């Protein structure tokens, strides 16, 4: 389960950074390079550790659609 917990955490971070990247692009903010580097680091980690990319994408979708209660229950299953 540790790898699932880490993979879900990476999916959360990726979704958050993607949203920040969109906002930074829209408003022309200086953080674009740092955010892009963060996204690349997550992608590198996924491949270096051999994570299941389909599962990563499912976790991203879950994170985007979960209610707070569903999120809390899911996190407990990963512990």
Task: Describe these PLM feature segments.
Residues 19, 23-72:
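Acidic, low-complexity, intrinsically disordered interaction modules
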Residues 1-2, 14, 57, 69:
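Glycine-centered signal
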